[in-house]
Amino acid sequence: MAVSISVSQPVTISGTVINDKGKPLVGANVFLEGTVLGAATDLSGYYIIERVPSDRFYKISARYIGHRMTTKDIATEEGKPITVDFELVMSLVDLDEVVVAASFSERKKRAQASPVTIISQDDLRRLPVRSIDEVLTGKVPGGYANLPSRPGQNNSAFTLRGGTSGSGRPLGDVKIYIDGVELLGFDMQSYPGIADFIDPDDIEKIEVLRGPMGSTLHGSNAQSGIIHIFTKKGSRSRKTVIKLKFARKITQAPILDDDAIGQETTFSMSGGNSSSASYNIGFNNSIDQEVMPGNGRDIERLKVHGSVNAKIGTAVIDIKTYHSWGQQGFISNLYHLLEYKEDRSWTNAPEHWDDSLASGGTSYYKPGFSLNITHSFTQDWYQSLVIGNDSKKFLYKKYYANSGQGYLTEDWNRYTLNYFWHYKKKISNSFNIDLTTGTQRTMSNHVRLSGSMDERKDQYYYEDFDDVSIVDQSNQNSGYYGELVVDYKDRIYLTIGERVEQNEYFGKDYGTHYSPRLGLSYLSEIGGMIIKSRAAWGSGGINPPKAMQALPSESNYSINIGNPDLRPERQSGYELGGDFYFGDNFFVEVTYFDQLFLDGIANDPSIDDLQTIKQEYWYINLGQIINKGWELAAKTRVGPLDISANYSILDSRWGEDSLRQNDPVYEGFFDKGTRRNDVPSSTGNLSLVYNVPGFSPKSTKGGSVALDISYIGKKKGRDWLLYYDGQYNPDVSPFSYYSKDLLMHYKPFNSVRLRFKYWVTNKASVFLDIRNLTEHTDISRSIIEPALGKQVMMGLDLEI
């Protein structure tokens, strides 16, 4: 007797995804609902989903940022491939967009109780972008960055709600991730930059989460928010795509009374196997002349990246690596102060201002990698593992013709391990639950060796140094987190979360810390308007003191006496807000926030002994900081014109401080209710983007013209010129660092940027980018590093 077994053969579903103007949408997600099957579109808008079980009914959906999700019903039949094409209508209703910044796991934006800003690949693709901080400045309410002071410089201090990823601000940190891996930050005395090793052309999207209410699951050093950068994967189509960019840069250098010239070249190649694997590789090289008198060396940078993405059964494996090299000479950043020396009679100015520039320079190498593995048990249950490393090696060599050499080398390493699982379940016709739980661990170390020697060598050993100094420090953070979202009829979302963590910094155990979180969002409709009301409360992780703050150190000009009794910074806060959607083409976001910071850490030079050559200082805890404000954002489309704007009001003041508020020495600086220095009272941005259509069959892509106007409001600060008058002009009495006579208000200013990009053919485009048209120079924070003047960049983009 023969037994016949029939096994149905799977089928293939393919098609294209375009917008309502007929243009392909690159990176759109197409998926079969209720399954783990899906794919992303390539540069032609094409997708393919293979090995789909036959003889079944499915709902297939296409989703793309800035467009309305579309779903279709299909039936598969053995031996018959299916073609399903989608045309997505542009829409500002983004409630179904998936974000991961708040909870690590994927969750729709409608369930988020805190505001999340998403910057899509489309935003980055249609206009020339130099660095990521420029994008964030215009797109994120309450966010801004200081203007760069050197060519090619990416700001390491992008500010959110008055807190910053930079140093010197007692308002916590912004934690930055790339593909799930935490970057080195100021907790390790490293300057992370926002994109000093990532080419903006390699970015797929950026998610920004503001404040402690949404960042509690991320633990320490994330008090002010999260910036999560996702880089591109390859295309699973069998096409190989090559991109080239050539750019020329001209930067005004007022100090030199000349222009600084630069050039940039970018190459990338992506492709893969349509069924299971893809790759993406590329590099970016830039050379810029200095804008200040230097020792003849340019600023050189090289960035290289690579990624491989593979699908094996129900698991997706994504491996990425990046490498960055850079070098530059020494500049005289005191050069323009010589003008003040003459004009303001600074006859007591330090003699070293007139010293000739030293030979040598600085160089760095920054490698990193990430491994992301996602495995689906069912369509509603998956696990994820992230393993990665961010490193940096820095070398400083400085020597004069008739004296010895100064030498400094620093090595940083940070390893990240994050494992979680995500589970969803429908428990009744009205209720759904969404649970994420996991563990995260980071291990960081920093080794610093400095000294001087008499002779110049290519390789140095410990015994070569005359006055060697070695610092070896390590940090560890271990956290366990969980978050539950209860959904009632897809309208009411209740979020409950908690992180429990331990921190050990430079050998000191800061114990166990708990970070709870509560959130609520409610969706309603009035006529044609959708309203999302939201409220959130959270207590962020601690910010332990940095080694440079707690431990003593000494430089050529100053002495830090150290303060081992520093307490970690803490933060909590709440926010209330609403998102209003008027049809597909108008959106308004309003948020009020109230955040309390405790034990902020800041530099205190008031202990300086004026009779000694070197300046003495230490770091202290500064009591309470109360940070309140409003954030407003709006977007609309009027024909081919896209308009977006945001405006933030920031009221950052000192609260209770028993240490300083009873001391008349600090009057005007730390009084209860007094505004903090260097925090603008308001920020804003207006962006107008006109989409230019293609004018011939050879140029269907068209292009864009954008005008960006950024506004920084009035801010309180020190009159640095008056302070130096007191130090260097013998006819002016010296001022203490905290003299209230130094206080002033810096006027508001605007920064204007014009960008243009047009595809002459479907394979070639030209672009022009003019930054800082108003030629504003901001000296409110440091008169030795004024902002750059007008910067012009022009070039050519090719796709092959």
Outline where the language-model segments fall.
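Outer-membrane beta-barrel transmembrane domain signature of Gram-negative proteins
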Residues: P254-S270, A349-N372, G406-Y493, S524, ...
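Outer membrane beta-barrel strand-and-loop segments of large Gram-negative receptors
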Residues: T266, R414-N418, Q473, N563, ...
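Short, acidic, small-residue-rich periplasmic hinge/interaction motif at the N-terminus
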Residues: I18-K23, A28-E33, S61-R68, E77-R125, ...
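Flexible loop and strand-edge segments within Gram-negative outer membrane beta-barrel domains
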Residues: S276, D288-R297, R301-H375, Y382-Q383, ...
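Short acidic/polar hinge/loop motifs at secondary-structure boundaries
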Residues: Y47-E50, V181-R210
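Gram-negative outer-membrane beta-barrel transporters
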Residues: L596, W618-K716
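Extracytoplasmic beta-strand/coil segments of soluble accessory domains associated
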Residues: E134-V181, K205, S215-K232
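Conserved C-terminal beta-signal and adjacent last beta-strands/turns
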Residues: S268-S270, N284, N309, I530-I531, ...
